[in-house]
Amino acid sequence: MTDTDRIQINEARIRAEFDELARIDSESFGEREMADRLKEKLAELGIQAKEDDTAEKIGGNAGNLFGTLKVGLSGTPILLSGHMDTVAPGIGKKPVFHEDGTITSDGTTVLGADDLTGVIAILE
């Protein structure tokens, strides 16, 4: 079995994850709820997240999250990176899932997918 054979992407789980996280208000400098939820999700995966003091330095309410997963393999470590914030208008986001597989906002806010999709890929 190859590594590719072991990869199992669960589309329903990804869509549900996107729906949940996209609905969290996380405009720049106001990512506290998103940071707390991501810490919970990382903990569910056995990853302890640490938060730095960036919030204090920039006038925000959440710092950067760092999680380390030790897998016991030799080789070069890799870094996965994403951001938690969205641009305005991003309060009260409502993702709309279309039959063709696309996801859009309801038109009253941004969708906030620019890096939420990256965050979800990291969680997956």
Feature-to-residue mapping (PLM):
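Extended interaction regions within the primary functional domain
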Residues: 16, 41, 90-94
